[in-house]
């Protein structure tokens, strides 16, 4: 059936016209942060979910209490429990971090060295109680010796090396048939590799990777049955080629295989390396390290990944970062992306010290919120009491509000403060400075949100102010959250209308903006103006103007709901 009208005498059915565009519908509680961890591929966003063991599998346990960067994973854990997920980047010292590799030699045992014999690269001989491997094709005339150019000292069938985070590992053409390396950022110092179940008929073998826990117990990480033919299939019809198996079945390791290597070349090597009960063999990794403390450039490099608009993100939290330059960059990214940013004044500071610290920081942004939480709490990971900040907990509080749906509309206008949403999910909460009294007026002037004890136990955030110092509505967090939500959906609508002709452009923009704002009226995010004489009695007003032939200007005036920050009771005596 044709779908194009031509001069032919035929019946044509045209493609359907569908102008039923919509925006929204995606997750609205995706967090973002940067952490220090013992493992996890560095400088790459990882999606961390609050269910299962997603965080510990990716990054390991939170660091010891006195370790550099110990707050990060603790705060991430709190955020991930309530957020849809958290885009998390591991930062490392890029000059000192190393990941290990194992390079397997393509060798052939030739026994004792003999004069007049033709030797090929990879041939291994014994002479004078030492082993040598041929480095070049030659006919033996003089006994093997290191430095001759014909022989190298043979140290074993596997060579070990380590590499920088952005260094690629390739098998090359210098005598190796396989290079194996971790991709999960683990230093792999307790990991070993075994070759098992060499099948000479099907021309396959099994690579089994092991690790050890803190008690020294060895357990299996992965077991992969592989072949060396690019078209090889396993018994279930899945690709069995070694590189494909690692890419599709392994989350921790990758390999590079020397193309063109034949089974006849590998079989004696595999049989010599095969792990058996009678002859147990395992190859360990060496040289992997997390390096020292990350430098400021490393932090900025990691944080900058959160700027990418292709990365879904609705909020940022500092996760224990207190460096002014890094906080300033995260604030800049939040302003650029129109999303909230939660950060802590260091919890170990006294009230006066906290005020001075925030003043010296000097941030100014309608998206940044500062919190002061001088509390310790029970540490579920390391035991005892530990002090860590609340930026992750505030991301969780924001997610709790977003999860209050009215039909399909998230509760973006709910403030992440108070006992209902702004509480800390911690036990054994105790104040570090119980004798100090907070001056709430001074806190307001500094736009510093205090975390205070609750009468029912625990603690909660007791204000929702941004680092915006003008006396207008933009100083309130929930106002900006609602504006940002509208901004994000407007961008979706504008993308749909982009490059359409005038009439269709106006229709799409008006229809979609009206849909967005009507939904927010239904949810209670938008309310009738408090000054009807000045602003009228409609919750919103949309104005669309074509400024130039290729430029459209869309304005939405909205009245956003308030929040009961202040409640006054007036006693009155009667006769």
Residue ranges and their predicted role:
Residues 45, 124, 131, 566-568:
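Well-ordered beta-strand positions in beta-sheet-rich domains
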Residues 510-514, 573-575:
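Active/binding-pocket-proximal capping segment
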Residues 539-575:
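C-terminal edge-of-domain segments
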Residues 143, 216-218, 325, 563-567:
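Intrinsically disordered, low-complexity acidic/polar segments
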Residues 107-157:
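Tryptophan-rich substrate-binding surfaces of secreted polymer-degrading and adhesive proteins
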Residues 126, 208-212, 559:
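A generic structural motif
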Residues 1-109, 157-509, 516-536, 541, ...:
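A glycine- and small-residue-enriched flexible loop/hinge signal that marks low-structured segments
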């Amino acid at each position: 059936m044709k779908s194009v009208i031509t001069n032919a005498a035929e019946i044509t059915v045209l493609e359907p016209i569908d102008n039923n565009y919509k925006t929204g519908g995606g997750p609205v509680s995706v967090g973002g942060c940067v952490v220090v961890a013992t493992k996890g591929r560095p400088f790459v966003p990882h999606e961390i979910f609050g269910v299962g063991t997603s965080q510990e599998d990716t990054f390991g346990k939170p660091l010891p209490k006195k370790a550099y960067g110990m707050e990060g994973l603790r705060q991430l854990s709190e955020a991930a429990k309530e957020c849809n997920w958290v885009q998390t980047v591991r930062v490392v010292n890029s000059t000192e971090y190393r990941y290990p590799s194992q390079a397997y030699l393509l060798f052939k045992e030739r026994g004792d060295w003999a004069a007049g014999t033709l030797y090929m690269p990879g041939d291994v001989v014994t002479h004078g109680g030492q082993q040598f491997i041929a480095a070049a094709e030659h006919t033996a005339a003089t006994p093997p010796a290191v430095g001759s150019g014909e022989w190298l000292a043979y140290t074993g069938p596997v060579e070990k090396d380590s590499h920088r985070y952005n260094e690629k590992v390739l098998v090359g053409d210098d005598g190796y048939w396989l290079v194996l390396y971790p991709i999960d950022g683990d230093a792999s110092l307790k990991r070993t590799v075994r070759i098992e179940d060499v099948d000479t008929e099907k021309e396959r073998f099994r690579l089994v990777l092991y690790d050890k826990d803190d008690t020294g117990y060895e357990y299996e990480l992965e077991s992969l049955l592989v072949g060396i033919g690019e078209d090889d299939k396993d018994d279930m019809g899945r690709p069995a080629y070694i590189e494909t198996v690692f890419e599709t079945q392994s989350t921790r390791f990758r390999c590079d295989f020397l193309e063109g290597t034949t089974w006849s070349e590998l079989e004696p090597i595999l049989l010599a390396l095969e792990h058996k009960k009678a002859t147990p063999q395992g190859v360990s990794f060496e040289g992997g390290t997390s390096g020292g403390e990350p430098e400021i450039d490393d932090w900025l490099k990691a944080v900058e990944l959160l700027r990418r608009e292709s990365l879904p993100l609705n909020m940022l939290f500092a996760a224990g970062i207190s460096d002014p330059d890094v906080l300033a960059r995260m604030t800049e990214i939040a302003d650029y992306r129109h999303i909230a940013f939660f950060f802590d004044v260091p919890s170990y500071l006294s009230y006066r010290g906290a005020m001075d610290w925030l003043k010296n920081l000097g941030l100014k942004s309608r998206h940044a919120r500062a919190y002061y939480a001088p509390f310790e709490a029970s540490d579920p990971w390391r035991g005892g009491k530990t002090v860590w900040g609340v930026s992750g907990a505030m991301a969780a509080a924001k997610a709790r509000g977003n999860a209050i749906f009215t039909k399909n509309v998230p509760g973006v206008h709910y403030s992440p403060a108070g006992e209902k949403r702004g509480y800390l999910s911690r036990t054994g909460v105790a104040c570090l400075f119980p004798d100090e009294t907070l001056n709430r007026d001074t806190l307001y002037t500094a736009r510093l949100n205090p975390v205070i004890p609750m009468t029912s136990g625990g603690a909660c955030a007791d204000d929702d102010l941004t680092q915006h110092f003008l006396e207008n509505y933009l100083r309130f967090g929930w106002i900006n959250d609602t504006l940002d939500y509208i901004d994000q959906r407007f961008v979706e609508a504008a993308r749909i209308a982009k490059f359409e002709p005038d009439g269709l452009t106006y229709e799409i923009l008006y229809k979609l903006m009206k849909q967005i704002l009507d939904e927010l009226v239904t949810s209670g995010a938008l309310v009738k103006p408090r000054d009807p004489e000045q602003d009228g009695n409609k919750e919103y007003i949309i104005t669309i103007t074509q400024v130039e032939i290729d430029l459209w200007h869309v304005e939405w005036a909205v009245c956003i709901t308030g929040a009961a920050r202040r409640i006054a009771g007036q006693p009155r005596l009667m006769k």
